[in-house]
Amino acid sequence: MKIKLELYGASRDFSNKDYLEFYIKEKIEIKDFRKKIIDYLKIKFKGNNNFRKIVEASAFCSEDNNIINNNYKISKDQKIGIIPPIGGG
């Protein structure tokens, strides 16, 4: 399935577009998707620790703009937004 990760705030530095696309073979919870994003950033940005911290501290939202928790399961093609903390916290 294709997950389009919409980038907001500081996460926009992850790409020259306003999104990243991930292709995942099976259902995935946000906590595991978060790890996939970090793995991608480790490769793309040679272990940029600040980017990892952004992902770890970020909230995620569903296509219908609801904040979702780490146990939320992505089970189909969908858009997910990553919302980094604002103002340092």
Model-derived regions, located:
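Ubiquitin-like/PB1-type beta-grasp interaction modules and other compact soluble beta-rich domains
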Residues: 1-88
